[in-house]
């Protein structure tokens, strides 16, 4: 079983019960290797891992994490455009003791680098991070709104969306969002789960709703999940 720990890294528990620490965050200890660009802050960090459908043949896994590698000037001056969450692809050796050949297949999922009062929230808020392969063979990646009202209804950004991509990060050709062909649906608050109905492949997300009422959403290609927290409105923002 592969798993991630938000502020530590990627590990695997083998059939014998042994735990192998594979790939750590910056300054982590005890891992076979580490990414110096990977960090945790608030709710951000290493948030998800999924095996390739052909893992038994290609030993490939995908990991979702927060990274400083692609921050750029946007993270200092305009955090609507701060690219700080990524999807990485790795090869795992046959003994399940180390990973190699890291490739960043998605580099521009937005991250919140500093605190805001309205909508409120500290650095690293609402990153999503859940991933799953669908019966169609594509990788579905759920992101979050970063507690920023601009995300929900802006389908040019990769916050508040579900991506549907291939193993190299390219959008599925049938995706209907023209602004960015990697996007399958938009208008999500903070995706915490992705699952597919066995009978017909219908995809569902579990995600945060306003206040404490979380929700299950049935996704439709090109659809809008409806999360629209206008900035500076009365009541709760993003």
State what each model feature region is:
Residues 120-146, 155, 160-161:
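Aromatic- and glycine-enriched pocket-lining scaffold segments that form the walls
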Residues 74-132:
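Asp-box/WD-like beta-propeller blade repeats and closely related beta-sheet repeat scaffolds
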Residues 2-27:
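Beta-propeller domains
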Residues 17-21, 92-104, 170-180, 223-227:
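Beta-strand initiation motifs
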Residues 9, 60, 137-140, 201-202:
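Generic structural signal for coil-to-beta-strand starts
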Residues 4, 11, 30-40, 44-46, ...:
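Beta-propeller domain segments
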């Amino acid at each position: 079983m592969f798993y991630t720990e938000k502020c530590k890294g990627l590990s695997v528990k083998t059939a014998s019960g042994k735990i192998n620490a594979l790939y750590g965050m910056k300054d982590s200890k005890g891992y076979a290797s580490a990414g110096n660009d990977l960090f945790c802050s608030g709710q951000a960090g290493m948030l998800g891992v999924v095996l390739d459908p052909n893992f038994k043949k290609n030993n490939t896994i995908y990991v979702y994490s927060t990274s400083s590698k692609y921050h750029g000037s946007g993270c200092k001056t305009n955090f609507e455009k701060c690219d700080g969450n990524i999807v990485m692809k790795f090869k795992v050796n046959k003994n399940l003791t180390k990973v190699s050949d890291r490739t960043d297949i998605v580099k521009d999922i937005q991250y919140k680098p500093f605190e805001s009062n309205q909508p409120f929230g500290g650095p690293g808020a609402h990153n999503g991070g859940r991933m799953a392969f669908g019966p169609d063979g594509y990788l579905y990646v759920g992101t979050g709104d970063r507690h920023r009202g601009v995300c929900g209804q802006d389908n040019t950004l990769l916050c508040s969306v579900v991506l549907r991509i291939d193993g190299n990060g390219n959008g599925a050709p049938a995706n209907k969002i023209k602004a960015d062909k990697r996007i399958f649906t938009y208008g999500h608050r903070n995706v915490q789960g992705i699952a597919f109905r066995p009978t017909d492949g219908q995809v569902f997300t579990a995600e945060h709703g306003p206040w404490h009422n979380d929700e299950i959403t049935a996704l439709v290609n090109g659809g809008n999940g409806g999360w629209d927290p206008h900035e500076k409105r009365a009541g709760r923002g993003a």
